[in-house]
């Protein structure tokens, strides 16, 4: 079959704490498989209050380094693959304004929806977790 774009826009890094390998390893594996576009979309950091630290996402402080690292690799591999950097995000109203400002400030390429929590990670159930609700 021809005419289809070989791309992946849902790639996590070690910063989300549940992915393994380096960005470089992901890029080189994608190139070997004929992928022409690769998007990195770590879970968007949340400006949690009260010192809460997520086990599934980077901190707000890690976001600039994440974007910088992907941009630098994009320059290095420009002749082999097109790289994009963005975030996978839930829509949580209490965080959205600050997250959108960070996204704009860092010059990210895209954001994908991944609504894993119905409320904040701190206060709502994970959508894949069984509950006692009827």
Predicted regions and their residues:
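An N-terminally biased module of ancient metal coordination in phosphate/nucleic-acid-related enzymes
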Residues: 1-93, 98, 102-103
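Non-cysteine beta-strand/loop elements that form the S-adenosyl-L-methionine
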Residues: 36-43, 108-118
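Active-site-proximal loop/helix segment associated with metal-binding centers of metalloenzymes
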Residues: 119-134
